[in-house]
């Protein structure tokens, strides 16, 4: 079911910027703010007069001159800034800027961080780079070069299709890794026990064979009777 149409009021007009206040309004505003005559319209002058009257009132009532104290503070700040500049001139090579320029040599002697740098933007040519590399290689001893070659060969070699410093293969390949044997019974003890067992078993076998031979050769067999 459709809703009934809503009754909309008249549309509001577009906002128009407020016109500047008239001269009479300015006078009324000034009169309300500063309680002055309608003819005075200079705001800056009115503010200066108000500050002057308030300063005189404070000086008469409390004996404290605001303007004089502010001038003293300004002079003290100026003197402190001058002392700071003089102190900075004595201590060369400081991080803070000073009024006097410092030569680069003096700054380098006082401040280890201040290093006189060469003009930037200079690029080396390929010939210069190769020449400097040759000089470095000539200065290196033979042992250092051998070590570097060995490290390069080690870095280039592969194992299981990977670098030697890479992760070891997992899964089936990881099952075939050589494991440490568990230390069990020592070998000499095992050998002695095995030999003792063999000796005892051989002695038992020999005794049994001797007994059997005696039983066979005692002359009671039927074959011996038939021969007789």
UniProtKB/Swiss-Prot annotation:
Ranges per topology, Extracellular: 138-228
Q: Superkingdom of this entry's organism?
A: Eukaryota
Q: In which tissues is it expressed?
A: Expressed by a subset of glial cells found at the midline of the embryo stage 12 nervous system. Expression is highest during the formation of the embryonic axonal commissures, a process requiring midline glial cell function (at protein level).
Under which name does UniProt file this protein? Gliolectin
Residue positions with a glycan: 149, 156, 198-199, 205, 218
- Please give the residue ranges the record annotates as the region Disordered: 141-228
Q: Where is the composition biased (Low complexity)?
A: 195-213
State its role: Has a role in intercellular carbohydrate-mediated cell adhesion.
Q: Which GO terms describe its biological process?
A: cell adhesion; heterophilic cell-cell adhesion via plasma membrane cell adhesion molecules; nervous system development
Per the UniProt record, the source organism is Drosophila melanogaster
- Topological domains, Cytoplasmic: 1-120
Q: Does the keyword rRNA processing apply?
A: no
Q: Which gene encodes it?
A: glec
User: Where found in the cell?
Assistant: Membrane
